[in-house]
Every structure is written in structure tokens, then in C-alpha cells.
Amino acid sequence: MIRHIVAFRLRPEVTAEQAAALLAELDDFPRRFPAMRRFTSGRNTSTRDDRFTHAFSVEFETEQELADYLAGEQHETFVAEVFRPLVEERAIVSYEYSPSEGDIMTAPARQHAPYGMEYARIEVPDIQATIDFLVYHVGLQLEQHTEERAYLRADIEHHSIELISAPQREVGHTVAVGFSVESIEVLSTLQKRVADAGFEILDLEERQQALCGEGFATVDPNGLVVELFTDFQEYAEAPHVEIRPLDLVHPFLVTDNFDATVAFYQDVLGFLPSDHVVGSTTFFRSEDRYHHSLAISRNRDEGTFVAHLCFAMKSFDHVMRMRARALYKGSPIASDLVNHSASTSIAFYLHDPQHGPRFELCDRHRVFTPEEQETHRPRRMPADPRNIDVWRPAADDWGRF
């Protein structure tokens, strides 16, 4: 832990009202900066040294969290516009210490979500056809392949897509999603929250158990298996393929059980809302700080399912090269170039139902700063196509999504 202490003396001309306003704003810091721990403040009561009139003390888990707080725009604005005009002198001390075992006051101010999405498990009727589709059109690299199962990866993570041969299916269907978790401690907390909320705790899929550290699975209100784990296996190098995704960013869920689904992912798993399209969709972020690592949309008379998986490409040029491949092969582009209002990414969507959900290939998906991660307030945008794709010219232009 890092303890940060600031002692200060107010200027003689500062009024009681000004002093009270300053101290009230300081006391509001823990709400505005959730990374803070054990914030305390007060008037100096020392009989040995009365040089400073007030002080406050706060703790952070890491030096980086302290640095992010000090460099953040909110903090710098407060210091320049509120603190310095009223303070004549100050002293600052920061030091590292080890908290006592069992000290519950060092717990985070907010519950942590999973870190980020790692993979989707998809059952498909023709596994070889889907492998060929994902290699050519998405840029994934095939790593392991049997008649029953295949693993494909985007970057160094063991896999981004796991395919299961299901010849009895007419179309592909996503049966599970996997999210990594930062630590055993966070994983244990997540498992307790899931159990306390009345959801069943399951073992990870047998093969997945061998590919990670600790973990567990549960089932969301729609029947989708959610696997949570630490220490996902990695390759030493990324695939030696120039045009490929860098990361699997998020799943987009469509559900006829919207409220219960939102409650599960937000209240139980701890995902943070980033933006709302009112009456339609909520975008959630996790600890990897993407604008959204999960999106949940109300049923549009299409059933309940994983509607798409988003992959981040290296550049807009690579997005367009993949689009050119789709046009060349005559592969269906379900939704052409979209300039997203929420994530600021530009993307297009491929969809051949036999291979499962739509595959979104995007560039420049917004990543929050550490300060934004803790302080961002979600927008409430009306259900207007221009609040989904800012290139749409009119409020009734709902086609082509």
C-alpha cells in the first residue's frame, strides 16, 4: 500500500465559509476517486507544531494508482482552481507500507469486475468450413485441430475462439464466453458474489481447466455459460501474420430477459456501465478499460443469443483490407462501415449463420484512461440511429444495421 499525506496551512484572509467549502470538497474525494482507500482529514490539534492548520491522509494499492490520481485532470483542476488560491503553505509525504493481515479497511472502494474477454466457445455444423472462414476473413491463426474441436488465436493468448463440432446444428451457436481475472483474490470475491446471488458455481470445462490457473463457471440468466479464471496460457510470440486482430474485445448479447441480465453482469460480476441507448442497449466495461467489454441489448424479436463478437484490428487499413476480402469472396457483410458513437470505433460486420455470431472487425475502439475508468459517468442517449452510427443522416435511418 502507498500512504499519501498532505498537510497545509490556510491563508489568513480565508473566510470560514471558504475553508468549509474546501474541506467539504476534500471529503468528497473518495466518491470522485474510487481508487482511494482509508481517506481521513481533519484540523491540526498538535501542541508541538502548529505550522499547518489541516491535513488529510489517503492510501492507494500501488504507486501507479497514486500517480494516476495526481496526474488526473480532476485533481489538477482542483489544485489549480480551489486548493492553491486558499493555501499558503503545504507539505506532502508519500511512502510504502505493508498493511496488517486481515485489515479490512484496505479493501477496494468498488467491487472489481473480470479483467477482459479471452474467448468464445461456438458449436458449428461444419467445423472445417468455420476454420477456413475465421482464418481468411477474421485473420485468426489455427493452433490445434481435431475432428471434434479447434482452437484459433488472435494474439499471444492461447485462443480467442474455440470451435466445437456440432453437425446436428443448422447454424452456429455460442455456448460459452471466457473472461480472465486479475488475481486469485478477485476471483474468490467474484465466486462469493455469484454464489451469494443464488447462481450455481460450476467447474470450468475440462479442457479449459488445463489452460489456466484457478477458475470457475456459472450460467447467466439466458443460459450462456460464463467462465472466469486466472493465468490464461500465452504463447511466447503473436502469430507471424500481418493482417490479423490484436484482441477479442467484447460479446454483444441480445436478450428477452434484459433487466435480469443487466443485474447479473453489473451487480454480481461488477461490470461498469459506460453508456446507455435508452430502452435498447447498455455498454459495460471491465478492468481492461475498453469502452465496453460487454454489451447487452433488448430482444428485437430475434430470440436470446450472442449477436456478435468484436475483434480489434491493428489499423483502419487492415479493417478495409478484410472488408475487401469479404467483397472479393462474396461473403455476406451484414452491416457495412459504422462509426460508433459509444466506442468511437469504425467497423464492419461479417455474418454467415453457419459460423455462429456476426464478427465485428473494428479500429480505434475507445480505451479509458485509469482516471476515466474510475470516474466516467455513462451517457443516456435516446434511441436514435445517429446514437449508434454517427454517420447516419437522419433519425429514421434504421436500415443496414
Task: State what each model feature region is.
Residues I2-A7, M105-Q128, T174-F179, D231-D259, ...:
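N-terminal beta-strand motif that seeds the catalytic metal site of vicinal oxygen chelate
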Residues F39, L140-H173, L224-F232, H276-V306, ...:
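Conserved short beta-strand elements that form part of the metal-binding/catalytic scaffold
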Residues A20, H112, R121-H159, Q209, ...:
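Core segments of cupin and vicinal oxygen chelate
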Residues F29-R38, P85-L86, A197-F199, K329-P332:
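Short secondary-structure junctions
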Residues I92-S94, D103-R110, G116-P125, Q168-R244, D247-D256, T282-R285, ...:
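Vicinal oxygen chelate
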